[in-house]
Amino acid sequence: MQNKNNYNWLKEWVIRSFLLLTLLTWPSVSNAYPIFAQQGYENPREATGRIVCANCHLAKKPVDIEVPQSVLPDTVFEAIVKIPYDMQVKQVLANGKKGGLNVGAVPILPQGFELAPSDRIPTEIKEKIGNLSFQNYSPDKKNIIIVGPVPGKKYSEIVFPILSPDPASNKESNFLKYPIYVGGNRGRGQIYPDGSRSNNTVYNASATGKVIKIFRKEKKGGYEITIEKTSDGRQVVDIVPPGPELIISEGEFLKVDQPLTNNPNVGGFGQGDAEIVLQDPLRIQGLLLFFASVVLAQIFLVLKKKQFEKVQLAEMNF
């Protein structure tokens, strides 16, 4: 028993050490995770309606969300976020190589709506969710859920299990029509939350002048481009990380901000919205009673008409 405990402790220590080493060695990869955006913004949706993910994912792409037209209180339902893209394309990874696109999404629900507890999620919804792991944007914002990055080929459609509020126990919610907002991205961003650029964007010349040298870094990849400034003859060196492809050559004259590389980005970010009605069960019952009364009234009207016709026929025979 003691040996088993020691083995489990050693296994956990190795895993934690590996994760820590990964974060320290490849910061550009760790920066892709939502936690870094969470640390920078108290609310992911600005007053203008813009979702802050667009600050890092600069290209605009479509996204869609599907929800039921209406739901009853204290009910689990599914919200489906669709993040379409060409499955054949490859993105530039942090090490400069090509790989599959990842996706992520952030639905912003009305106050009171939240991620459904695991024991409340129906089996058919669990099967659609797969191995996805969701988390709240912050402890005090349970109505904002985030997921990603996850493999896009498997999760271009993400199913979120949502629990509707019950106004009987939650006084902040009411039987109304509510908006739901969503942001979704495919591929890596162009700018990290700290303002630095990733290798998944265009790199531009920092000065006007002549390219006098292009040095390719064989070990780490990327380029050092030496530009002789036209204004004073001084030399500046622009660093291009591995990933983007050069579109300039030695001897070429450049203007400041002229692209040095292509744009390797094949992904992008999009926003969408939908509406959902938190339906009052009593209202539905009242509506059913109304329909029943209309049907009964029609039946009685038909019976009364037939009775009247019989009376008329009897009088004519008399």
From Swiss-Prot:
Task: Enumerate the residues binding heme.
Answer: Y33, C53, C56, H57
Cofactor binding, per record? Binds 1 heme group covalently.
| Required cofactor(s) | heme
Transmembrane stretches, start-end: 284-304
Q: Name one GO molecular function term.
A: iron ion binding
* Biological process according to GO: photosynthesis
| SUPFAM superfamilies according to UniProt | Cytochrome f subunit of the cytochrome b6f complex, transmembrane anchor, Cytochrome f, large domain, Rudiment single hybrid motif
One Pfam family, please name it: Apocytochr_F_N
Record's protein name: Cytochrome f
